[in-house]
Amino acid sequence: MINKFFLALICVIFLNSCEFNNADPIKIIKITTEHGDFNVWTKRTGNNPTKKVLLLHGGPGANHQYFKIFDSYFPNENIEYYYYDQLGSTLSDNPQIEDLWTIEHYVEEVEQVRKSLGLNKDNFILLGHSWGGILGIEYALKYQKNLKALIVSNMVPSVPDYNNYAKNVLALQLDPNILKEIRSYEAVQDYTNENYLKLIHDNYYPKHVMRIPAANWPEDVSNAFAEINFPIYLKMQGPSEFGIVGDASLKNWDVTEDLKKLEIPFLSIGAKYDTMDPIQMEWMANEVQNGFYLNCPNGSHMAMWDDKENYFAGLINFINTL
């Protein structure tokens, strides 16, 4: 009788374990907006009740694919993490409603995603890269009570300062003849000219976006760039790679005066060759109340790829101290 009881108990435990382990990691989350309900795509990897990282991709309008490098590091450290395509991005709905492409919308979208995934202040670590860093900061300024920590990767707290750095520092590092030609296209706002795009791709990207020859870019990165939602990108970021210009909605974004409001553990990740000023990224870590700075000496804007060892060693160390 006892043997049968324990046999039955073992079977129940085994079946419950199988059910948990085989649970579908993909979750489609309904997002409610003033323009109706839409679905966004998420995918969970791992299981850790105290360390759950939600990844906010850049763009705006890119997707989760360039984060797949995390698969080579986080599972070994037992860090649970979530891929998430923001509304308008590849695997999520694309309602093509311009009123939704705002910081305010995306902050509330992240909050709805958090609730659906069951994340809370005891486990919720938010990591935003580039535009995702803007979104992460804005989310934390409104909802930091829900966060365990915030990680801002390769983003500064001021777009006007970013514009100044791009125009007066990085641009001047280009060959003068190349820069003259680039600026001739920008002067007439000919941002879609094939030669302009080639000049940027051949001369700017390999130095400051990802320091890997374009022909050798990882497929996950190439796919993320190829699938970017340009209407969102153009509305929020604008057409130029030398800062945010024109009528782009992020042009005047600046939270330098608000950083001191952030009390949660905060990691700023910068890189020597980034499109963003590494000095500003370090300064940001000193402005918040509980900040840390990680420098990637060999990296650029995609430091998780071109300085991966420094990037992930520092990132994982920060997460493990929480």
Predicted regions located by residue number:
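Short beta-strand/loop motif that positions the catalytic acidic residue
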Residues: 262, 268-270
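Flexible "cap/lid" loop of the alpha/beta hydrolase fold
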Residues: 150-191
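Catalytic active-site module of serine/aspartate enzymes centered on a nucleophile-bearing elbow/loop
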Residues: 291-322
